[in-house]
Amino acid sequence: MVILGVDPGLAIVGYALIEKQGNKYRVIDYGSINTPSKLESVDRLKIIHTDMVNIINKYNPDQMAVEKLFFNKNVKTAIEVGQARGVILLAGSQARLKIYEYTPLQVKQAVAGYGRAHKSQVQRMVKALLNLNEIPKPDDVADALAISICHGNSYRLNRKWGTKG
């Protein structure tokens, strides 16, 4: 199963493609979609959508896992992330991908074993679980890898116990 994990944002979208076979993960690719701050929001969203469609077409993932929007004290940031999530979800839906969403707490729990783990703890676990030489940068990319791992673990358990992801 090939999983496309996405950490949404307007400035930087982290993405990661991993293959899960049994209890093992293999990294296919990861990176970021960066949008220039000088552009209007609508143009930045267009870049995100176009690039996400291209990534989906290139790698043909089986499923998509996206971080859920959590309440942010900065309303402007929350709106921008929500808009980015919208075009990301649209790209996945247009490709007829099964889309799963996970909260930051669920991702931390699945990857580090503790829902309140610090970002650095999650990043070290991502590095270890995927046998990477270093923690991927920027943080958004490491987060996308963590989201992919979270889905791989959660999907396996949900299939076993018949619960909804």
Swiss-Prot record:
Active site (record annotation): 7, 67, 140
Tell me the cofactors it needs.
Mg(2+)
Give the subcellular location. Cytoplasm
Where on this chain does Mg(2+) 2 bind?
Answer: 67
Kindly list the positions annotated as binding Mg(2+) 1: 7, 140
Q: According to its UniProt record, which reaction does this protein catalyse?
A: Endonucleolytic cleavage at a junction such as a reciprocal single-stranded crossover between two homologous DNA duplexes (Holliday junction)
Query: Matching Pfam families, A to Z?
Result: RuvC (PF02075)
Q: How is the cofactor bound?
A: Binds 2 Mg(2+) ion per subunit.
State the GO CC annotations: cytoplasm; Holliday junction resolvase complex
GO-annotated biological processes: DNA recombination; DNA repair
UniProt keywords, alphabetically? Cytoplasm, DNA damage, DNA recombination, DNA repair, DNA-binding, Endonuclease, Hydrolase, Magnesium, Metal-binding, Nuclease
Gene3D superfamilies from the UniProt entry: Ribonuclease H-like superfamily/Ribonuclease H (3.30.420.10)
Output the superkingdom of the source species: Bacteria
SUPFAM superfamilies assigned: Ribonuclease H-like (SSF53098)
Whom does it interact with, and what assembly results?
Homodimer which binds Holliday junction (HJ) DNA. The HJ becomes 2-fold symmetrical on binding to RuvC with unstacked arms; it has a different conformation from HJ DNA in complex with RuvA. In the full resolvosome a probable DNA-RuvA(4)-RuvB(12)-RuvC(2) complex forms which resolves the HJ.
Family indicated by similarity: Belongs to the RuvC family.
Function description:
The RuvA-RuvB-RuvC complex processes Holliday junction (HJ) DNA during genetic recombination and DNA repair. Endonuclease that resolves HJ intermediates. Cleaves cruciform DNA by making single-stranded nicks across the HJ at symmetrical positions within the homologous arms, yielding a 5'-phosphate and a 3'-hydroxyl group; requires a central core of homology in the junction. The consensus cleavage sequence is 5'-(A/T)TT(C/G)-3'. Cleavage occurs on the 3'-side of the TT dinucleotide at the point of strand exchange.
Protein name, per record:
Crossover junction endodeoxyribonuclease RuvC
Please tell me the species this chain comes from.
Answer: Halothermothrix orenii (strain H 168 / OCM 544 / DSM 9562)
Instruction: Name the gene that codes for it.
Output: ruvC
